[in-house]
C-alpha cells in the first residue's frame, strides 16, 4: 500500500491538540483523518511527528499515512487543500519510502515560544504570543538557558508525573533573543517530554522577571521533581517550528520520543 508523507502548518487555537479524541473532529489528527477517509473512501490513519497540545500551533508538522488511491500525489494534495479548513494548511505531499513513519523516523524537533514583552497590546498577534508586559532580563535568561542544554533527565520539566519511560533527552540549543517588543525562545533537541518546552519557558521567564536565579538551573535538573521548576507557560505562544529527519529513512524499530 502506498505510503505518503506530508508537511503541514496549523493554527491550533480552536483545536484540542493534535491527537484524535474519540469521534470528535476538533483535533488536527481527527480533522485530517476525517477528510482523507471521505476523499479516498477508506479508513485512513494519520501519524504525526508528535502530539502538540490544545492551543499550540505548528509552522512545520510532518505526518504520514497509507492509502490505496489512483490519485497522483499532486492531485491528492490539491484535493486535500480544497477540503481542509483555512486554519490547517498542507504544504507538501509526496509518496515516500515504505518504512517511513512520521513519528518513528523523526530525529529532532525545534520549537519556538513567542512572548510579547510590551505594555502596548498586540491585537493582531494575540492568538500567537504570550503577552507579558513586565520587563525581562534576556541576558539572565540566556545564561540560564545554557545551563539547561545537554543530555539530562528532565523529570523536573515534565507534567506527566506517572511517566514510566525514560525522561532523558538531549537539548542541543536554547536561544533567547529580543526582536523589538518580542522575546523569542527557540528550543532544539532530539525530543521533548509532555509540556517540557512550556515548563522550560515558564522557568526561564521567572529568571527574566528576577524571581529565580539563573544559577539554580542545575539544581532544578537534579531535583527530578516537577515542583522544583517554574509554571507551565500558556499554549498560545508555542509553535512547532521544524521537524528533522535523516536523508535516508532508517528501519523502524524502537519507539521515538515526542
Where is each model-derived feature located?
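Structured-RNA-binding interfaces characteristic of tRNA pseudouridine synthases
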Residues: 1-258
Amino acid at each position: 500500500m502506498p505510503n505518503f508523507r506530508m508537511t503541514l502548518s496549523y493554527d491550533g487555537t480552536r483545536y484540542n491538540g493534535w491527537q484524535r479524541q474519540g469521534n470528535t473532529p476538533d483535533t488536527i489528527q481527527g480533522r485530517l483523518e476525517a477528510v482523507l477517509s471521505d476523499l479516498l473512501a477508506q479508513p485512513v490513519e494519520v501519524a504525526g511527528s508528535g502530539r502538540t497540545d490544545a492551543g499550540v500551533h505548528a509552522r512545520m508538522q510532518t505526518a504520514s499515512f497509507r492509502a490505496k488511491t489512483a490519485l497522483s500525489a499532486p492531485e491528492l494534495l490539491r484535493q486535500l487543500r480544497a477540503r481542509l479548513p483555512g486554519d490547517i494548511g498542507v504544504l507538501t505531499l509526496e509518496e515516500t519510502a515504505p518504512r517511513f513513519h512520521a513519528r518513528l523516523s523523526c530525529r529532532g524537533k525545534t520549537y519556538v515560544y513567542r512572548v510579547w514583552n510590551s505594555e502596548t497590546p498586540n491585537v493582531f498577534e494575540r492568538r500567537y504570543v504570550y503577552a507579558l508586559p513586565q520587563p525581562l532580563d534576556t541576558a539572565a535568561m540566556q545564561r540560564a538557558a545554557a545551563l539547561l542544554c545537554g543530555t539530562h533527565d528532565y523529570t523536573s520539566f515534565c507534567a506527566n508525573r506517572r511517566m514510566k519511560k525514560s525522561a532523558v533527552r538531549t537539548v542541543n540549543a536554547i536561544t533567547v533573543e529580543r526582536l523589538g517588543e518580542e522575546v523569542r525562545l527557540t528550543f532544539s533537541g532530539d525530543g521533548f517530554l509532555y509540556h517540557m518546552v512550556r515548563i522550560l519557558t515558564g522557568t526561564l521567564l521567572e529568571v527574566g522577571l528576577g524571581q529565580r536565579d539563573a544559577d539554580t538551573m542545575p539544581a532544578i535538573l537534579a531535583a527530578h521533581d516537577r515542583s522544583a521548576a517554574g509554571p507551565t507557560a500558556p499554549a498560545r505562544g508555542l509553535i512547532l517550528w521544524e521537524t528533522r529527519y535523516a536523508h535516508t529513512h532508517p528501519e523502524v524499530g524502537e519507539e521515538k520520543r515526542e
